[in-house]
Amino acid sequence: MERIRGLEEYVKNKEYREALGLPKEKMENYELLAQGEYNINYAFTHPVTGKKLLLRVNCGSQMHLQHQIEYEAHALKLIEGSGRTPKVLYVDGSKKILDHGVLVMEYLPGHAMDYHTELMLAAPCLAYIHSVTIPESEEILIHPDNPLKAILEECEEMFKVYLESPLGDEEKKTYIRELLNLGWKRKAEIRLESGYQCCINTELNSTNFLINGEGKSNYLIDWEKPLFGNPAQDLGHFLAPTTTFWKTDVILTSEEIEKFIDAYIKAVGNRFKADMIREHTHAFIPITCLRGITWCAMAWVQYQQPDKLIFNESTFKKLNAYLDMDFLKNIRGYLEP
């Protein structure tokens, strides 16, 4: 816990301990569980209930939000009824005692999804989550009017970091610019019909799923970038090569993609109208690829900074792989007609 200045003192404060029903004196032990690019997670066992819990410390916001941890907690509360996401137990984004937002949630069982053997288990998991009705009065979740345009604008912001950096490769700057131009051209040719909207995750990497097996509860964690939007945006992200290749070396075949969409539509059943899901998913996949590439370009520059709080060696290696010209040329194939 020494990595986060003040965290050891934070978990001893009265408000935190009373809210979670912890003894006045700290008895629990916090162990580093995992870290992403914007959060560090610690696991601990509640000394009174014996339940395993997760302490999440927020270190940044992809969405440039002032209240990132509250936003994530709000989304989790909205979809708690799905039974496929962690229950929020405590949230503090005040930053009065600690310079970071803090979230405590239940610890869920399971292992990271294996694309080769467990791909289809993600379909009913997503269907459960997407089927949760969001109240009409909901105003906190961000709701882009034009999701494809919103993704491309985000891509432009991220690419700008690489483009303006003297560390960036000039050939790659030119090539990524060409890919973005293809993305804008493709977006102009696509008209997504408005339809069912729900809370979507937008970050469906294999490690964000906790798999327990067929006939058991499988979960989706890591809700730092949720939106109110088209469920096909989640499918497009989940199936895109820039997603599957991230933590593995898997790129799904066209047949695997179609089978997954079939399984998802079947899992949805009559809970909401899913007749346009396939068409919309294929509209999101190539644009999602651009998001993956431009995020890697931005992150590559950030990883050159000596004061970066979170540094993942495996991530740095993947950043270089995604910016390899052969990989970029492969992505071009998804953007060209």
Where is each model-derived feature located?
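ATP/Mg2+ or Mg2+-diphosphate-binding catalytic cores
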Residues: 292-337
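Active-site activation/catalytic loop segments of kinase-like enzymes and analogous catalytic loops
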Residues: 234-271, 286-306
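Conserved N-terminal boundary motif of the eukaryotic protein kinase catalytic domain
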Residues: 23-32
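Acidic, serine/threonine- and proline-rich low-complexity regulatory regions
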Residues: 271-283
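ATP-binding pocket architecture of kinase catalytic cores
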Residues: 31-153, 157, 166, 189, ...
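Active-site acidic catalytic loop and adjacent metal/ATP-binding pocket
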Residues: 33-46, 50, 54-55, 184-233
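Conserved protein kinase catalytic core
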Residues: 62, 96, 112, 209, ...
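An alpha-helical support segment within catalytic cores of ATP-dependent transferases
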Residues: 7-24, 134-202, 212-214, 326-335
